[in-house]
Amino acid sequence: ELAEQFGRSLAKTHSVTPASFGAEQDGFIGLAPLPNRPLPTWEEFYASRRVMPYLRAAVDRGALTVEQAAIIERAMKQIHSFSGDSEPPALLHGDLWSGNMVWGAEQIHLIDPAVHGGHRETDLAMLALFGTPHLQKVLDAYNETSPLQDGWTERVALHQLHPLLVHAVLFGGAYGARAVAAAQSLFDHATSE
C-alpha cells in the first residue's frame, strides 16, 4: 500500500543527516518568509527561527493577544523540558501537510518543500495537523523503519506550534487559539506526569 511505502521512504529521507539545524538560505512557507540560518541545537533553531518570528507577527496582526502570546513564549523558554532526548538533524520536507502530497498510482510525490535540517518529529506532526489520509499506516511503517523516541506523540503539539502560528499570521481565524491550546497542552502534560 502507498501509505506504508511512503512511511518507509520518509524514514529513509529523515536518516540523511544535514550538517546543522537549519539551512544556508532563508526560504518561504506559503507566502511567509522562513528564516533558516543554522543553529547548533534543534531547540534553539525551533524557538528562534520557527516559533518566535511568527509569534511576534501573530500579535502584530491581531491573531493573538499579548497574554496568549506569553503562554507560547513561556513554552519556548522551557522547550528543553518538552523536546525529548536530542537527535541529530534530519533532512526535512519542512511543509509536509496533505496538500503537499500527490497520491499517484505507484507512489506519493511531494511538492512545495521547505527543506532544512530539523527534528524528524516535525514532519510527522505536520502530517497529523491537517488530516493526512491513512496517517496511522504511514506512522506505523515509519516507526518500523526508524523507531521514534518514547513520548513522541506527547510532543506533537510542540512541533505543531510553528505551522499553527504561520496560519495565524497568514489567515487569522482560530489558528492563534489553536497554537495557544497546543502550548498549554505541553504544560498540562508535564504536570500530569
Regions found by a protein language model. Name each.
Residues 14-21, 58, 83, 146, ...:
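A general structural signal marking secondary-structure boundaries and capping sites
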Residues 2, 157-160:
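An acidic site on a long C-lobe helix of protein kinase domains
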Residues 3-6, 68, 72, 179:
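Hydrophobic packing residues in well-ordered alpha-helices of helical domains and bundles
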Residues 29-80:
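Active-site catalytic-loop/activation-segment of kinase and kinase-like phosphoryl-transfer enzymes
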